A protein has these predicted regions:
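Glyoxalase I/VOC metalloenzyme domain signal
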Residues: 1-6, 11-33, 43-98, 116-133
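Active-site/ligand-binding-proximal alpha/beta "capping" segment
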Residues: 101-104
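Short, small/polar residue-rich loop motifs at catalytic or cofactor-binding pockets
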Residues: 107-110
Length: 133
């Protein structure tokens, strides 16, 4: 048997703010989870997404420090249509989350935008552009 991809784990320095961000994007995160040091949800298709607070990470990796600089990964959320990309970007930035790249029509045929979650991780919003007539 070969290993099977199963979980994306992220460290967070503010569990409540992080979970609020991902709840706004539609993830079904249980109420009260923000008080836990480890939270995970199962996404459609079975992949799990998990967050550990800084103290939890340091419990098994005492030398861990939050990364700095630009994100090295991003999570991409498909929206229903290009207008939804704009709407979600506006809603999240108006709620105080960091917008990195405002929505644009990408040359690869998608409406695209990039935000950062509260820990600076890249979060992309995208939707296919209508085909040109």
């Amino acid at each position: 048997m070969t290993p099977r991809f199963d979980l994306i784990g992220m460290a967070t320095t503010d569990m409540a703010r992080t979970l609020d961000f991902y709840r706004r994007l539609g993830l079904d995160i249980p109420p009260g989870a923000e008080s836990q040091p480890h939270v995970e949800v199962t996404l459609p298709g079975g992949i799990r997404l998990a967050w550990d607070d800084a103290e939890m990470v340091r419990s098994f990796d005492p030398d861990w420090t939050p990364p700095t600089g630009s994100p090295r990964h991003s999570l991409a959320f498909r929206c229903a249509d290009p207008a939804e990309v704009d709407r979600w970007y506006a809603e999240l930035t108006e709620a105080g989350y960091e917008g990195h790249l405002k929505p644009w029509d990408a040359f690869w045929g998608q409406r695209y935008a990039v935000l950062h979650d509260p820990d600076g991780n890249g979060v992309d919003l995208f939707a296919p552009l209508p085909e040109a007539d």
